[in-house]
Amino acid sequence: MHPRFQTAFAQLADNLQSALAPILADHHFPAMLTAEQVSTLKNTAGLDEDALAFALLPLAAACARTDLSHFNVGAIARGVSGNWYFGANMEFLGATMQQTVHAEQSAISHAWLRGEKGLAAVTVNYTPCGHCRQFMNELNSGLDLRIHLPGRAPHTLRDYLPDAFGPKDLEIKTLLMDEQDHGFTLTGDTLTQAAITAANKSHMPYSHSPSGVALECKDGRIFTGSYAENAAFNPTLPPLQGALNLLSLNGYDYADIQRAILAEKGDAALIQWDATAATLKALGCHNIDRVLLG
């Protein structure tokens, strides 16, 4: 078990500990539960779906990287597939505050990058900030997405974001988590192809500036992130943050990164290179390359 989970795990009910122990045994537990695992945990612990999600929130919050605020937020995105995806807030010392990833963004990006097609609910241990409410409004679940908070009745995003502005106001039909493939040809080595594949998945209906990042760890593991734009622009999630989020959720540290590649168009309206390189260098990675999409 990764050390970050030990305190939260020790506070769980005994029957839930017994069911979770073999799942968490892997140091690189992927911070997600399959639909089958969720069903097993519910039956073993005698909890309904909502109660189980609340019980697991401390494990999600344990994944937070909060060197600046020391305020851990955890979230669980519940996919329409039945799979659950952990998320937690991330802060990057030496970079800018704008690079921060919020817990809801973390869980949603986690689900999206693992191929989830839509979300039924998000469970989070603190009220979503306005930034996250706007981020969630980009999803194909729209304002019907259920939001669950401890000690409160469940509400929809519509309740938390009245008079919402979103992609439909801009006549955008393809939403975040809808399947997309922009068709750029895969070239180069495995890491380069992974970055291009991530760029092909980008949600960028406003700038038409696709981008993707691939990070290679010293053990050969590769994590990718795709660009996710937002109708309100500022809640947009850059591709590097998506990749760093997956890397961290899987129990890796920034020091494990040995190489990074950004794939983007050289003539795009928005360029990720400077911000991507600056953030990676702040985290200790200097082996950074860029491949231009044709």
Curated annotation (Swiss-Prot):
Tell whether Metal-binding is among the UniProt keywords: yes
Family, according to the entry, reads as follows: Belongs to the cytidine and deoxycytidylate deaminase family.
| Purpose | This enzyme scavenges exogenous and endogenous cytidine and 2'-deoxycytidine for UMP synthesis.
Q: How is the cofactor bound?
A: Binds 1 zinc ion.
Keywords attached to this entry? Hydrolase, Metal-binding, Zinc
Q: What is its EC number?
A: 3.5.4.5
Q: Which InterPro entries match?
A: APOBEC/CMP_deaminase_Zn-bd, CMP_dCMP_dom, Cyd/dCyd_deaminase_Zn-bd, Cyt/Deoxycyt_deaminase, Cyt_deam_dimer, Cytidine_deaminase-like, Cytidine_deaminase_bacteria
Q: What is one term from the GO cellular component aspect held by the record? A: cytosol
Amino acids binding Zn(2+): H102, C129, C132
Ranges where the CMP/dCMP-type deaminase domain occurs: 48-168, 186-294
For this protein, the record's NCBIfam families field holds: cyt_deam_dimer (TIGR01355), PRK09027.1 (NF006537)
Positions binding substrate in this chain are N89, M90, E91
Q: What's the protein here called? A: Cytidine deaminase
Which PANTHER family does the record associate with it? Answer: CYTIDINE DEAMINASE
Q: Which organism is it from?
A: Salmonella typhimurium (strain LT2 / SGSC1412 / ATCC 700720)
Q: How does it assemble?
A: Homodimer.
Reaction catalysed by this chain? cytidine + H2O + H(+) = uridine + NH4(+); 2'-deoxycytidine + H2O + H(+) = 2'-deoxyuridine + NH4(+)
The active site of this protein is located at E104
Signal sequence range: none
Q: Name one GO molecular function term.
A: identical protein binding
Q: Name one Pfam family in it.
A: dCMP_cyt_deam_2
The keyword Cytoplasm appears for this protein: no
**Necessary cofactors:** Zn(2+)
